[in-house]
UniProtKB/Swiss-Prot annotation:
The lineage of its organism: Bacteria, Pseudomonadati, Pseudomonadota, Gammaproteobacteria, Enterobacterales. Belongs to the AsmA family. The gene is yhjG. It is a single-pass membrane protein. PANTHER family: ASMA FAMILY PROTEIN YHJG, DUF748 DOMAIN-CONTAINING PROTEIN. This is AsmA family protein YhjG.
Length: 686
């Protein structure tokens, strides 16, 4: 062999020897010696404790799926046991994540193209604890060591990372959130066989079009949310789908908290950045008010409800997020509801906007909004209030609602919502239709401008203003009732079908207090009512359940059916006490004047009724009548002393020029002389 050949052989032999020695060293190297260095470096980079406390090892294996010369290149198969990741210094708990064992395979040839490629990684029984102490203090936000020293002009790294699959047998996530008062455990299990998105949602065409990933893991949740027990089940996509910006991440869940249920299925867009969601969303429960604790959206207390709609959300935690609940359908009590609502987060307050419609609205289902028993479902609504610490405070013997308006919550959001009710049900007969209102809530200032609805062939329009930012709340109501037909007000009463009369009215009230009773109890304002061409009888009073009216009509007119030409009332209200300027009835037999007071604060009546015969017919009553007692239990009787002199009632009414003129304004010009009240009030003005 020549000298050159010997040198070449020696170099080749030495090179092969080095390779063999390197392979032997790598194969027999105790990788546990690197644990202190790895633990220290990772802990410093993450700014929180990290440790591999168990065995760290590498096994080199050839990959059978590779072909050609690549099949001879061994791949490192790494395993590490008993891994812990701690919390930041300001989180009292020690451990955030614990992994009994992690395995992964690295593709070595990919390093030549500056790619770190892990074909798979397997996690054994991962256990994580997510903690949030305040809005800005949690353990899942990482403050990396070089975050503060990043060069804004630095070029991105030439290296890339690729992960093809994440496997694990069973995982557990514990959530301790002081903000939402959540203390939950979520158990994650592989489904065994991935479920196509379309099989769960029933939207095959849509799923294929959007290339939604399959459901891979099942979820079970238990614990407490906002102090209430919560349980639930669900499904989510694979972990790799989390990083796919173009692939929506599938989610499905069904949660229950008490009697409140929230169920949804759909997708999360750009899940690593939580860019938004597109879900079919269902709610149900004892009261819409219960959803405040779950969603942060302020809604009124109602009878039992359920809704089903589509939620499309665009989420931006830095600026504001938009949650669009589109085309929902459902019910509240026995009333159907439909519409779309948009909830926008942001400063100074989030805002709720949209349109809601009910084709058949049961008026009693609106009862809890104003503190009135809603009938069917009322018990569940009351239990919902008691669960929140809101006990019924209606005193015995009182009629006016005492339930308090929750003004302390009115400043949590603003609202601009329009509501329409096409057909209204109230009891068996009261004819109400076409209810509409524009609800505006801004900085705890609530307005219903306007509130309109049809009633008995006429209309009622109102502007309601409640200043919830004032202590106590200030309230104002301006109400107009026009051309309510008497026979339609009582369609089931045969007697009233004989009349063509109408009722008109105006009310202006101002008050303060946090309930209807309190507002009226110190209210100031005026109430005007005018009725023409009516009928009255003892039988009518009995039908409508007015025992006091039955007594009074019988005392004045006996058992006769009496035509009422005009009934007029102009009441001044001061400090919750109503005093009539005019309160009179002109009938075919008598002219009746009512004086006295009615107190909204004490709900006490103290009225005197003076009748005066008209024409030849003489009424038999020899003394005035009184009505005393409470709104709930009024008592009527005959006052001591004779009736006032004949003609005195008419003379007294004739002096009330200004109140009479105010009542004339209630008569529409189109009615002309057909309205008998016009003639009577015009005579009073002269």
């Amino acid at each position: 062999m020549s000298k050159a050949g010997k040198i070449t052989a020696a170099i080749s032999g030495a090179f092969l020897l080095l390779i063999v020695v390197a392979i032997i060293l790598i194969a027999t190297f105790d990788w546990n010696r690197l644990k202190p260095t790895i633990n220290q470096k990772v802990s410093a980079e993450l700014n929180r404790p990290f440790a591999i406390r168990g065995d760290l090892g590498v096994v080199w294996e050839r990959q059978k799926q590779e072909t050609g010369w690549r099949s001879w290149v061994p791949w490192p198969h790494v395993h590490a046991e008993d891994i812990i990741l701690g919390n930041p210094p300001d989180i009292p708990e020690v451990t955030m994540v614990h992994l009994p064992r992690v395995e992964a395979t690295l593709a070595p040839l990919a390093l030549l193209t500056k790619t770190v490629w892990l074909p798979w990684i397997k996690l054994e029984k991962p256990d994580a604890r997510l903690i949030r102490l305040s809005e800005k203090n949690n353990n899942w936000t990482f403050n990396l060591a070089n975050d503060d020293n990043k060069d804004a002009n630095a070029k991105p790294s030439a290296w890339s990372f690729r992960l093809d699959n994440i496997l694990f047998d069973q995982g557990r996530i514990a959530i301790d959130d002081k903000v939402s008062k959540a203390d939950l455990e979520i158990f994650v299990d592989p489904l065994g066989k991935p479920l196509p998105f379309s099989e769960v949602t029933g939207s095959k065409g849509k799923a294929d079009k959007e290339k939604v990933g399959d459901y891979v893991f099942g979820l079970k949740a238990q614990g407490r949310y906002n102090g209430e027990p919560l349980t639930g089940t669900g499904k989510i996509g694979g972990m790799l789908a989390l990083r796919g910006e173009g692939t929506p991440f599938p989610v499905q869940a069904d949660f229950r908290s008490g009697n409140t249920r929230v169920a949804f299925d759909g997708v999360v867009n750009d899940p690593m950045k939580m860019g938004g969601v597109d879900l079919r969303l269902k709610f149900s429960g004892d009261s819409l008010g219960d959803l405040y604790e779950l969603t942060g959206v302020l809604l009124p207390d109602t009878p039992p409800f359920e809704t089903d709609g589509r939620l499309v959300a665009k989420i931006d935690t830095e600026k504001s997020s938009v949650f669009d609940y589109r085309g929902f359908n459902g019910r509240i009590g026995d009333s159907d509801i439909h519409g779309s609502l948009v909830y926008t987060t942001g400063k100074p307050r989030p805002k709720l906007e949209g349109d809601v419609e009910s084709r058949q609205l049961r008026l009693a289902d609106l009862g809890p909004l104003i503190g009135v028993d809603s009938g069917k479902g009322a018990e569940k609504s009351k239990r919902s209030e008691q669960k929140k610490g809101e006990k019924s405070v209606q005193p015995a013997g009182k009629v006016l609602p005492y339930d308090r308006f929750e003004t302390d919550k009115w400043d949590v959001m603003d609202a601009d919502v329009r509501f329409k009710g096409r057909r209204i049900e109230h009891g068996s007969s009261l004819p109400i239709s076409d209810l509409s209102t524009h609800i505006i809530l801004k900085n705890a200032d609530l307005r219903l401008q306007p509130l309109k609805f049809g009633m008995a062939g006429g209309s009622i329009a109102a502007n309601i203003h409640l200043e919830g930012d004032k202590k106590p709340m200030q309230g104002r109501a301006d109400i107009q009732a026009r051309r309510l037909k008497l026979k339609e007000l009582m369609p089931d009463v045969e007697l009233m079908q004989k009349t063509l009369g109408e009722m008109n009215g105006d009310a202006e009230l101002r008050g303060s207090g946090n309930s209807v009773a309190a507002l009226l109890g110190n209210s100031n304002g005026n109430l005007k009512l005018l009725m023409n061409d009516g009928l009255v009888s003892r039988n009518l009073m009995e039908i409508v359940g007015l025992n006091v009216g039955n007594y009074i009509v019988g005392a004045i007119f006996g058992d006769d059916e009496v035509r009422v030409n005009c009934a007029a009332a102009n009441l001044n209200i001061a400090n919750g006490v109503a005093r009539p300027q005019i309160f009179a009835f002109d009938t075919e037999n008598a002219l009746i004047n009512v004086t006295g007071t009615a107190s909204f604060a004490s709900e006490q009546l103290d009225l005197t009724i003076d009748p005066e015969s008209k024409g030849i017919r003489i009424i038999t009553l020899r003394s005035p009548l009184y009505v005393r007692g409470t709104f709930k239990n009024p008592q009527a009787g005959v006052k001591a002393g004779p009736l006032i002199a004949r003609g005195a009632v008419a003379a007294a009414l004739a002096t009330l020029v200004t109140p009479a003129a105010a009542l004339l304004a209630l008569i529409s010009p189109s009615e002309g002389e057909a309205n008998q009240c016009r003639t009577i009030l015009s005579q009073m003005k002269k």
